[in-house]
Amino acid sequence: MKVLGIETSCDDCCVAVVENGIHILSNIKLNQTEHKKYYGIVPEIASRLHTEAIMSVCIKALKKANTKISEIDLIAVTSRPGLIGSLIVGLNFAKGLAISLKKPIICIDHILGHLYAPLMHSKIEYPFISLLLSGGHTLIAKQKNFDDVEILGRTLDDACGEAFDKVAKHYDMGFPGGPNIEQISKNGDENTFQFPVTTFKKKENWYDFSYSGLKTACIHQLEKFKSKDNPTTKNNIAASFQKAAFENLITPLKRAIKDTQINKLVIAGGVASNLYLREKIDKLKIQTYYPPLDLCTDNGAMIAGLGFNMYLKYGESPIEIDANSRIENYKNQYRGKNNEKNFSNA
């Protein structure tokens, strides 16, 4: 079965063709560089650029896959969560194709797509712990299957990638912040500043993260946390921030691994490409899987791959389904016992 995967939840316009849930025939992505001058994503610009680009990106994906549009068996599209304007562009485009081609459509949750992405590169046996790190999401999950996911912990404020973007914007390090801070920090001393690392002691927040304190310390209270006589340079700020940002993840992650007794870890999301983070994770001495870069960031292949499996289990989504920018109380929404209700129609 050939599946056309469409992903437009944020600023990347992505279309892919995947066969039988795992064989990637094409995976085309158009980055919107217009946002760089604003040091962040402007929703109105993102949705307009998706409208302008999605047809040509789709044509490129089909051409790369050597596949005619009539040979597509299923259309998978991200319907939640994300920027509502961007989601609507992708969803309406997918609906138009489904109606005109008389093909089934399956709506996919963006978070579940990221959690599925590593499975397209490596054969990984369930269960495992997943760590999703991106500009919009930071969470730890326990996975027993592609649709049996329990969110153990998540950020209570900024996502990890979002904190990188905000610090980079303040110090004029460029956008997106993640790769720029990683590069700038290579020539810095990570011990120049001892920024605070947040860990929670309450049971209900045992696996959760927080980045607001770290972000505030780095942007507004810099000299308060200076611990060495090194100069206050961008390199030293970047290195010290990056160190604290990833130390922020380690304690909740260790807790999840210990409490679940699952010694298998899968890293997903754009931040997963950071090599400094990978060095930190590797020190945990557990079996760890990293997807390739093109599957770390937003992409259509993960939507098509998961869409294939969701369709076989749950069938198609109703054509009248709407996009949803947010998921209320999502720590409970993703528990395995609610899977059919929450995942079958995304």
Swiss-Prot record:
Name recorded for this polypeptide: tRNA N6-adenosine threonylcarbamoyltransferase
Cofactor: Fe(2+)
Source species of the chain: Borreliella burgdorferi (strain ATCC 35210 / DSM 4680 / CIP 102532 / B31) (Borrelia burgdorferi)
SUPFAM superfamilies in UniProt: Actin-like ATPase domain
Highest taxon above the source species: Bacteria
Its job: Required for the formation of a threonylcarbamoyl group on adenosine at position 37 (t(6)A37) in tRNAs that read codons beginning with adenine. Is involved in the transfer of the threonylcarbamoyl moiety of threonylcarbamoyl-AMP (TC-AMP) to the N6 group of A37, together with TsaE and TsaB. TsaD likely plays a direct catalytic role in this reaction.
Binding residues for substrate: L132, L133, S134, G135, G136, D165, G178, N274
Catalytic activities: L-threonylcarbamoyladenylate + adenosine(37) in tRNA = N(6)-L-threonylcarbamoyladenosine(37) in tRNA + AMP + H(+)
PROSITE patterns xrefs: GLYCOPROTEASE (PS01016)
Gene Ontology annotations of biological process type: tRNA threonylcarbamoyladenosine modification
High-level lineage: Bacteria, Pseudomonadati, Spirochaetota, Spirochaetia, Spirochaetales
Matching HAMAP family: TsaD
